[in-house]
């Protein structure tokens, strides 16, 4: 048993030994919590939060409330007599529950009636030798396990009266929580998924304020917390092993949501896979980031890339030795076969997903393939298909410089082409599943059609479009992808250097029917003069203060598109002349002129569209 697992086991064992005998009293109510993403590898995002909730629902968990539970937690500060500094009473907090009571407090910053709030003190549980049992971080799963004791502080006690009497004169830290609790009849605990707004932090310490308004609480960014809390009333009959197994089962459900796979693995393993990937592509980055995705982006096909021309030009043209395949309605991901044969998918944000598959052919270990991950077919049935369209590395060897497709039957042609290598790899992969011989992921190579002396690229396109129209694909397609036959990955006539980072390939094109065309907007939030975001409410003419509905707030965003004055002209040249905003010839080429600019459609023109 590893050191981390031993620590995890010992805390659960201590809790199981204590809970039947001590439910309350001076030592307090036992509380065993497991929190995710609060320390270490990766913070929890809104997408993570949503994915975990979906995964819990799919495993039979039910929310106790559809709207969630609203909680305002207030922690008072005190002056450290030794240093004179303001410090937070980390183990004592006041809690107000319910949106109506929270609204009331936010208006007045005065505690409600005595029965409508409570004060809690939380302390670390004690080991058998009466020393504190501190929380333990389990880095392998990016979680923290803590066993503590909670006591309610009576409001007429000395400590309670002190907190209440000094309330208005004491600075505080605030946390507003909207918590959705999931429960399952087979598990003795609650899984809490929380959206949190907190007082601002400076160097990981809360900034204290007297009021909610001074703390600017509701304008601060949201954070997301996921935790398992054992229900003491449901643990009867649970041994340490039984409770640990139940917890680990739910840890798996949560990690499956966070990693977007039915086969979650430890973050230690994911880190090792990421390091191996970077070493293979010879990228010197310390960690994975979006620009380490080596699959090149394609350009949108333009008229200049289609029109037949007799002029000598450097503009790539699909009439000149190109191949075409379908563009699937799936997610672009790299398929990476690790040094032990385990197969992972890596998306464009460099998030790694274990597929639950392995290759038993060591000839293809340390291989990188590019393709599209298609989860459902046209009818909505789950197919879990990976459709490959290129290969970059095979068994540690970089094959990106190879030409793509063989167009002739010339026996003298001894070149090795990437499409040939890709097909051989897929056919010889010897794919198996880790839980059985049937692999959960289906892997196929896409079919490419190339232009030749008897068939133009447009005839090749027609073949694919006819197949799509006649249901020749089990999955949805939304266009075509054009790949040059004679060039290595990312290479052009002028650029012959392979790159180990993200790039756009000006010889690779994508085309979509008009009904599938989209515009990618870059958004920024509208700011006030002081730089803070503009936040408005849905109802500005007044609100019903007797209602328990949450006040709906929104931010104003500005839609922006990429604009380059060197290529696209000037946004408003007449106004530039009036304002004497004339670019200097000496520095016009030294400035990065590609920038996000507010979107102004020209047909029809609408100055307020952004």
Regions found by a protein language model. Give the residues of each.
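Phosphate-end processing signature that detects enzymes handling 5′-triphosphorylated RNA
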Residues: 1-283
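Nucleic-acid 5′ end/cap handling module spanning
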Residues: 24-28, 32-37, 111, 123-134, ...
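Intrinsically disordered, low-complexity regulatory tails
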Residues: 131-132, 167-184, 200-281, 376-410, ...
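Structured beta-strand/turn binding interfaces of compact recognition modules in eukaryotic regulators
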Residues: 37-39, 122, 183-185, 194-196, ...
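Short helix/loop capping segments that flank catalytic or ligand/cofactor-binding pockets
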Residues: 44, 191-193, 201-203, 236-239, ...
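Eukaryotic intrinsically disordered and solvent-exposed regulatory patches
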Residues: 16-20, 166-168, 178, 195-201, ...
């Amino acid at each position: 048993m590893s050191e981390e697992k031993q620590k995890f086991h010992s805390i659960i064992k201590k809790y199981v030994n204590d809970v039947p005998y001590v439910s309350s009293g001076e030592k307090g109510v036992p509380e065993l919590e497991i929190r995710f993403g609060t320390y270490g590898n990766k913070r929890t995002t809104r997408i993570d939060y949503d994915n975990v909730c979906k995964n819990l629902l799919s495993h039979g968990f039910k929310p106790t409330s559809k709207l969630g539970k609203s909680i305002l937690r207030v922690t008072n500060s005190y002056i450290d007599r030794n240093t004179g500094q303001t410090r937070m009473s980390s183990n004592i907090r006041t809690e107000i529950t319910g949106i109506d009571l929270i609204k009331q407090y936010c208006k007045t910053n005065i505690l409600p009636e005595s029965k409508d709030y409570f004060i809690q003190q939380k302390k670390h549980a004690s080991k058998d030798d009466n020393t504190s049992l501190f929380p333990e971080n389990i880095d392998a799963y990016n979680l923290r396990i803590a066993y503590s004791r909670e006591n309610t502080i009576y409001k007429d006690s000395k400590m309670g009266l002190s907190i209440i009497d000094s309330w208005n004169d004491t600075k505080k830290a605030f946390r507003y929580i909207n918590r959705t609790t999931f429960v399952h009849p087979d598990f003795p605990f609650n899984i809490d998924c929380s959206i949190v707004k907190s007082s601002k932090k400076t160097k990981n310490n809360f900034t204290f304020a007297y009021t909610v308004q001074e703390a600017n609480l509701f304008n601060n960014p949201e954070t997301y917390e996921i935790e398992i809390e054992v229900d003491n009333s449901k643990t009867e009959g649970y041994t340490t092993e039984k409770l640990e197994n139940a917890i680990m089962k739910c840890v798996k459900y949560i990690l499956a949501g966070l990693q977007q796979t039915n086969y979650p693995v430890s973050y230690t393993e994911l880190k090792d896979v990421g390091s191996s990937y970077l070493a293979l592509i010879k990228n010197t980055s310390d960690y994975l980031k979006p620009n380490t995705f080596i699959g090149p982006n394609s350009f949108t096909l333009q008229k200049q890339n289609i029109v037949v021309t007799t002029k000598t030009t450097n503009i790539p043209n699909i009439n000149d030795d190109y191949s075409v395949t379908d563009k699937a309605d799936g997610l672009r991901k790299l398929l990476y076969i690790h040094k032990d044969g385990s197969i992972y998918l890596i998306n464009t944000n460099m998030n790694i997903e274990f597929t639950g598959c392995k290759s038993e052919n060591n000839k293809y270990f340390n291989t990188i393939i590019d393709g599209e991950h298609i989860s459902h077919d046209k009818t909505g049935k789950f197919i879990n298909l990976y459709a490959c369209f290129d290969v970059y590395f095979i068994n540690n060897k970089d094959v990106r410089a190879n030409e793509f497709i063989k167009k002739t039957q010339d026996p003298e042609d001894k070149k090795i082409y990437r499409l040939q290598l890709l097909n051989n790899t897929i056919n010889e992969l010897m794919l198996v599943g880790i839980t059985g011989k049937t692999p959960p992921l289906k892997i196929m190579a896409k079919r490419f059609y190339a232009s030749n002396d008897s068939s133009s690229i447009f005839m090749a396109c027609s073949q694919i479009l006819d197949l799509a129209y006649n249901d020749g694909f089990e999955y949805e397609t939304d266009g075509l992808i054009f790949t040059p036959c004679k060039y290595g990955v990312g290479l052009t006539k002028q650029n012959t250097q392979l790159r180990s980072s993200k790039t756009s390939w000006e010889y690779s094109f994508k085309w979509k029917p008009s009904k599938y065309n989209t515009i990618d907007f870059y958004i920024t939030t509208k700011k006030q003069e002081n730089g803070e975001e503009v936040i408005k409410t849905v109802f500005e003419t007044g609100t019903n203060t007797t209602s328990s509905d949450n006040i709906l707030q929104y931010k104003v965003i500005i839609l922006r598109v990429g604009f380059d004055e060197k290529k696209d002209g000037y946004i408003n040249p007449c106004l530039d002349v009036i304002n004497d905003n004339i670019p200097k010839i000496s520095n016009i080429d030294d400035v990065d002129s590609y920038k996000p600019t507010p979107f102004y459609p020209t047909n029809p023109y609408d100055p307020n569209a952004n």
